[in-house]
C-alpha cells in the first residue's frame, strides 16, 4: 500500500471506532477526499452490511489497510514520510491555524473513549477542532469530515499557488 502512494497522501487510522454507522460515514467521507483507511491489528472493525449501506458506494472506493502492531505500523509510516496526528477534543493545536503536511495520518479515536493513550503519545502532533463549547465535541464521523476537508483545503491552496506562479506540480496535474 505505501509503495503506490504519490507525494501527497492522507490516511485515517481508526483506533477503537466500532459503530458501523460511523464507520460507513467515515468510509464515504474518505472516498470523497481520497483518503485510505487504516485498521489496527486486532481491531474487530470490518465492513458490515450496515456500514456499506451508510457508505452508499464509498466503501468500494476506499483502500482499507489492516495494520501490523502499532509500533511497526508507526515506524513504517514515518519511514514513508508520514506525520501522525492524534485528533483530540482538547489540548491540541487549532486545526484551522496550522499548516498540514503533504503526507498525513489522522488518528481518530473511538466514540466516547477517544484513542489509546499510548498511541496518542506516539503521534507527532495533536490537533483539535475549535467549537462553540455548546457540546463537548463532534462525533467521530463528523469530526473526520472536518479534518479531511481541512487537509483538502491545504491541497487546493497548494494547487492555486502553483497555478498563480505559472508552475503546476506534476503530482496535481493529472
PLM regions and their residue ranges:
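RNA substrate-binding interface of SAM-dependent RNA methyltransferases
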Residues: 2-93
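Low-acidity, Ser/Thr- and Arg-rich intrinsically disordered low-complexity segments
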Residues: 154-165, 169-174
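Short glycine-rich anion-binding loops that position phosphate/pyrophosphate groups of nucleotides
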Residues: 19, 90-92, 110-113, 133
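Structured adenosyl-cofactor binding patch, chiefly the S-adenosyl-L-methionine
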Residues: 32-36, 46-58, 72, 117-156
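Structural alpha-helical scaffold elements that stabilize or flank donor/cofactor-binding regions
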Residues: 99-100, 119
